[in-house]
Amino acid sequence: MVDSDDDGDRRRDKFARERRDEDYRRGGGGFNRYDNKRPGGRRDDYQVKRSRGDDADDSFDPVSRSGNGSDLPTESDSIYSGPLQTFKKFLTSQEDDISEEDAIKKYNEYKTEHRKHQLERFFRAHKDEEWFRLKYKPDDAKKLREAHLENVQKRLQVFNELKEQGQFNKFSLDFGDAEAIIRMLDSVVVKLENGTEDELKAVLAQKLEDESLADIKKDENGNGTEQPKEEPEVKQESGATEELEEGAIEDGTEKSSNKVNIHRTCSVFLRNIPPGLTYEELEGLCKKSPGFLRLALTDGIAERKFYRRGWATFKRDINIKEICWALNAHRLRETDLNAIINRDITRRVRTNNGIASHKQVAINDLKLAVKLTVLYDKKIGLFNAADEADADREMDIRMGVDLVAASTNPLIKEVKSLVPHDVLNDISEEEAELLGVSNGGEAPAEKIRFERDDNILKALDLLIVYLRIVHSIDFYNHGHYAQEDSMPNRCGLIHVRGQPPSGVSITTDEDGALVVPQKFVNDFISGFNSRIEKGLIEKQYVSEEELEKMGKKDGEKEVEAFIQKNTVELAKDKWLCPLSGKKFKGPEFIRKHLQSKHEDKLEEARAEADFFNNYLADAQRPVDCEPKQAPRDDHRGGGGGERGGYGRERDDDRGPGGGGRNSFGGGGYDRRPQFPPRHSLGGRGGGGRYFEDAPRRQPVSYRDLDAPDDIP
């Protein structure tokens, strides 16, 4: 029995999709040989399931509820709750006689409102998560910037110390100097870890083990002579591994403890950190293990429901396996951390294309390095930008102020003294047109001689090392290691120039000098500039008009709305403040009460508006991933293929095609177990016919082999 006609309709509509017209085609209906064994009418005895709101999917938001207590969302909310509707689907909710112009206008308005609602929903869902607060909340973001500035100033001090000692004059950023480059990186790490001079000397005296050094030896000795030397080393290592497995761990530990390992660490990679888990909670767990140094956490990853990843760093002389097991034995927020041992970096010096040593390429790279240096000095607030406010520095960058001319970094002046005056001067577009060096000028030569200018490369190397040490920018990899000070390797690797280019198009002239195609050089410069621009320089800004469209909030209006929310009229000359529970004679008394007794709440409302506006102002703001649309199946009656065959998931059976809700493609509500997919059977269609939509084999051709050749 049902209480009303509406409930009866809802009950009948529950399995409406199982009684499609398509299910009754070809005389099969929704029945198959399994359905005949089930008593009819059994389905109607089941209790009707409670409806579920459309927005109660795998998002972070609760089910929308209307004012009458129903679980169904209101009409105004449901249109913005799910994914963005297509124009065709949007038109189904409009009047039939709507004009094309009005339809496009309303659809654009719908898209704007949908985007605004989605951003608001995302903000409410994630505003209490730590990674989101550190990124956009004014107070937390300020603390993070101050900590970053402190780390950069420490790195600048280390750079100046090594420069005064002449450490950067011992090598060039070429792959052949890999050993000296690794020594320099180790020196940086020791000083960042506040190591003493004795520890630094001990580290520099140790033998280096790196794959880049092995590659250099192979190039020097040849492939044939190096292989016999490697075999006994491998056997010795395998023997050492066997001893460790048999229980001789203490010997290895004693040997490693005699070395100075201040520049080396062990680390654990945490693959599964819930978004609600804080840094302090995870750090407290890691501190229970001996030798803990630091912890690094990433931002929430949209593709993983904003779970984070992390690296816990420990001293080198501890048993990292036991620590990893201990971390996996704990569950935080009912979640396994899935910790694994992080592998060491085995190749600390990596190569870029050797054409980077060519003079024309080096001049281009030098200009880019100068631009990056002054830009990141300005961003972080070094030298003359130290006394400027964050907003003023950002405005100068956005307005395109000449940062090179305004920079007081002494390194820029030193670089200018190392190269000719005209090398760093960019000519204007008008001057380029007059000189004929623009696109319309004389065509360049097909091939040019490979030329190397040591003075330009020396100036370039100084800037690249500065960027790598101070700002954690790997120039030749066009990458910024933003969290390097919290990572296991604080200055782990660097990319340098490789060997001179070789190939079919690279030839030599009569003097034996390399000759390279001009187009190859131009293409390399163009591609490198593009990657540097996109990866390190370019920043997208959101206009004020766009912010207003996305729902930018006014702090004072939010405060006023908070006051109005806490001003409730009970009767004539009787008003209530829900925040404190006190009653007043008029609304003006409540306003004074809130401004005097609850000023912190008003500041929270104002700060919440700034918090939300900071999120909107980020052009690369995180958003929820759009759900992937399932491929449409045009064969609705057959049920074969993906949507009607064996092995279909129960959730997938709700969609069109396949003829019903069971995994066999029949029309009944079947609770039989699902079988593994059997592609050879295709699927069992709604019409009860097997192999209907399965891929068909080529028909066999029957031919009389004894027939004459002229008869087909």
UniProtKB/Swiss-Prot annotation:
Biased composition range(s): Acidic residues: 240-251
GO biological process, one term: primary miRNA processing
Compositional bias ranges of the Gly residues kind: 656-668
Subcellular localization, as worded in the UniProt entry: Nucleus
Family: Belongs to the ARS2 family.
Main location class: nucleus
Bias-annotated ranges (Basic and acidic residues): 8-26, 34-54, 214-236, 621-637, 645-655
Function: Acts as a mediator between the cap-binding complex (CBC) and the primary microRNAs (miRNAs) processing machinery. Contributes to the stability and delivery of capped primary miRNA transcripts to the primary miRNA processing complex, thereby playing a role in RNA-mediated gene silencing (RNAi) by miRNAs.
Keyword entries, A-Z: Nucleus, RNA-mediated gene silencing
Residue ranges with Polar residues bias: 65-79
Record keyword Nucleus present: yes
Family annotation (PANTHER family): ARSENITE-RESISTANCE PROTEIN 2, SERRATE RNA EFFECTOR MOLECULE HOMOLOG
Name used for this protein in its record: Serrate RNA effector molecule homolog
Record region (Disordered): 1-80, 214-256, 620-712
Keyword Nucleus annotated: yes
GO cellular component assignments: nuclear body; nucleoplasm
